[in-house]
Amino acid sequence: DLDGHDANWNGSLESNELHTNLLEFMADTHPWIADTDGDGMWDGWEYQQGLDPNNPLDTLTDPDGDGLVNRLEYNNSRVGTGYSEVDGIRSTTPLLNDTDGDGLLDGEEIFVYFTDPTWNDTDMDGMPDGWEVQYGFNPRDPADARSDLDNDGHDYDRSQAVEPDEYYTNLQEYLNGTDPTNPDSDNDGIPDGWEVQYGLDPLDPLDAVLDMDGDGWDFNRNGEVAGNETFTSLEEYS
């Protein structure tokens, strides 16, 4: 009855997507009827996803609490909200509330943010949808990856302006684990962008008081540079 499920939505059923006659027997479903309980969800998908292919009532339940009932998990395009579809997969997992693991519930993606619940970076800008939402960005706009929301870039060429190539972009903030709304994530007095540019750790406040390149001076001529003789990273920045 060809009631397997095309899980990758590529238009064909691979061997691991078939709901074989043996599985029909094990699930007590009808081998000649694709949807034994007539609930609009094919037996193979229900069995694969841990639902009951003999219970028509589970079509309107939401076991994972993500805001999508099972019939909408089975085919997201039934929703009709105009959400973005990136990877062509229109089925979410009915027992997992965040199918793509981006930090947003499947229902939130479809009804609130109009993002793709099976692809964790809808605008493909390198920043996951959930992270963008967390910090107030638009998960459907790739341009915000290139901006510098908190202005923690630096005027390296001393032109009196921070040009785009001197930005510490939102994408860099994500990749380095820094806060794109706070120019100094570790509160050490040095902007995140400057720390990353010079190989410091923007999440470690202690590197502000270190003399990374050893360019302090032994003012008291005692054979070592110590204490207030160091030229710290914070002083280098200042």
Predicted regions and their residues:
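Extracellular calcium-associated, cysteine-rich motifs in secreted modular proteins
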Residues: 1-238
